Amino acid sequence: FPNNHENLEDYQRTLKYAYLYAKTVTLGKTHWPDTNRVMLRNRRIGCSVSGVAQFITNKGLEELKVWLEKGYDVIQEWDGMYSDWFAIPKSIKTTSVKPSGTVSLLVGATPGMHYPESRFYIRRMRLSKHSELIDPLKKAGYKVEPAFGSEDSTVVVEVPIDVGEGIRTAAELSIWEQFSLAAFLQRHWADNQVSCTATFDPETEADELPHVLNYFQYRLKGISLLPRHELGAYKQMPYEAITEKEYEKQVKKLGYLSFVGVEGEQAEVDKFCNNDVCEIPLMSETI
């Protein structure tokens, strides 16, 4: 989250610890031998940036370019140093731009490289219907409903959001500008694929798609496309634009949200198991 840092040095310090965490993960072992062989060889990681739209709004595109390039260089320096210390290969890929939707909510950042749907919008999140978070959310006035298509196992929670003044919205960006930003991040930061879902107006921009894809096929590793519709492309979309009046109406319904007494949820995972059969690695004795 570069926009959450006071200066470049502060940001580079965060990158160091993000890199160390990611690199340390590659020292572990999965229960898939094929995966282990690839990971031992490639040590592939992906330190991501998020809140890109906010950084551009506050500091400009040129400053973002400087931060990204210097940040990328410092990650390569750390990778060279720590790979030598660990006696392992340098990572073939080190940087990325991930969607970071839910994670971005925790720090008040826009997700990944994406601009907000509008200044005011509904953010929907999916939870297990057995989650201990549901009752506190309902008591605080948040709308909770069954997830379409997964009614037996999942619920969707709606949260009204105001991203503040000044920042542009996704509807204000042409399909060309969205592709250009993705290509900018691919060039100046990410050696993994940039995660980008470019939205477009099907009535005015649909004919542009063959041309924009043709031009950017040499500058992007991949991209997703989503048409913008007034009622949304599908039910319970993650982001839905609303008016300021609707936002204020939703906020007035909300009370105090307290998670006191809610215990953390730990996923139960059967390691090294396939159905009812488990693989137990044998430890050979060294004489």
Where are these predicted regions, by residue range?
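Hydrophobic, well-ordered secondary-structure elements that form the walls
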Residues: 52, 101, 216, 278
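Catalytic alpha/beta core of large soluble enzyme barrels
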Residues: 1-31, 41, 99, 106-270
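Short capping micro-motif at the N-terminus of alpha-helices
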Residues: 92, 105-106
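Short, solvent-exposed segments of well-ordered alpha helices
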Residues: 36-39, 43
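Short acidic, low-complexity intrinsically disordered linear motifs used
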Residues: 265-287
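Catalytic-loop motifs flanking and including active-site residues across diverse enzymes
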Residues: 44, 48-51
